[in-house]
Amino acid sequence: MSNIDLSASSNLNVENTLVPMVVEQTARGERSYDIYSRLLKERVIFLVGQVEDHMANLVVAQMLFLEAENPDKDIHLYINSPGGSVTAGLSIYDTMQFIKPDVSTMCIGQACSMGAFLLTAGAKGKRFCLPNARTMIHQPSGGAQGQASDIHIQAQEILKLRERLNEIMAGHTGRGVEEIARDTERDRFMSAHESVEYGLIDKVLERRVGGE
């Protein structure tokens, strides 16, 4: 079966880049971390680029690790993604709902398609965008090939997934399922403040305040 995708059509492949290292002094001497591992110690997870199986497995593993480390402390998920695979995204979504800690979500840059779906899946009251971030919602898409009967089966699967995604998004945004279905017929782009009005997020953060 072909992979069903929920992503912005203009996405770009993210090239591997040099990851900065952080050196800390400890009682046992110097210890170095890559920047993402150091931020993981602060319970920060980055969801960056295309949502696909390998990336989803890493995000899920990090959430499970942080839950085991402290089940009562929030996890902070920073999202900058054009979207991607529906099944990979749903594995992240289900884990967010399954684990004990609240998962706070923050859009930096863009949260499109499956990225927007995961953004709105954060704990109520803890879903944020930076002021110039953009979000976009639309319906899933997928390519099908083979015999006519196979194409029909795959088309039915896409329709079932679309219905389920609309139901989930309706629950998180407070919108009706029919309204979500209409709004996702085509690409719907929103600014950070429009995302608040729609119910995708709870607040636009312009500056860190207190424990935010």
Curated annotation (Swiss-Prot):
Q: Which organism is it from?
A: Saccharophagus degradans (strain 2-40 / ATCC 43961 / DSM 17024)
Similarity comment text for this entry: Belongs to the peptidase S14 family.
Q: Where is the active site?
A: 113 (nucleophile), 138
Q: What is its main location?
A: cytoplasm
Recorded catalytic reaction(s): these are: Hydrolysis of proteins to small peptides in the presence of ATP and magnesium. alpha-casein is the usual test substrate. In the absence of ATP, only oligopeptides shorter than five residues are hydrolyzed (such as succinyl-Leu-Tyr-|-NHMec, and Leu-Tyr-Leu-|-Tyr-Trp, in which cleavage of the -Tyr-|-Leu- and -Tyr-|-Trp bonds also occurs)
Q: Name one GO cellular component term.
A: endopeptidase Clp complex
Keywords, sorted A to Z? Cytoplasm, Hydrolase, Protease, Serine protease
GO molecular function per UniProt: ATP-dependent peptidase activity; ATPase binding; serine-type endopeptidase activity
At the top level, the lineage of the source is: Bacteria
Q: What is its EC number?
A: 3.4.21.92
Q: Where in the cell is it found?
A: Cytoplasm
Tell whether Hydrolase is among the UniProt keywords. yes
Q: What is the lineage of its organism?
A: Bacteria, Pseudomonadati, Pseudomonadota, Gammaproteobacteria, Cellvibrionales
Subunit comment: Fourteen ClpP subunits assemble into 2 heptameric rings which stack back to back to give a disk-like structure with a central cavity, resembling the structure of eukaryotic proteasomes.
The record, for HAMAP family, names:
ClpP
Question: Where, if anywhere, are coiled coils annotated?
Answer: none
Q: What does this protein do?
A: Cleaves peptides in various proteins in a process that requires ATP hydrolysis. Has a chymotrypsin-like activity. Plays a major role in the degradation of misfolded proteins.
Instruction: Identify this protein by name.
Output: ATP-dependent Clp protease proteolytic subunit
> Record's NCBIfam families?
clpP, PRK00277.1, PRK12553.1
Which one GO biological process term can you cite for this protein? protein quality control for misfolded or incompletely synthesized proteins
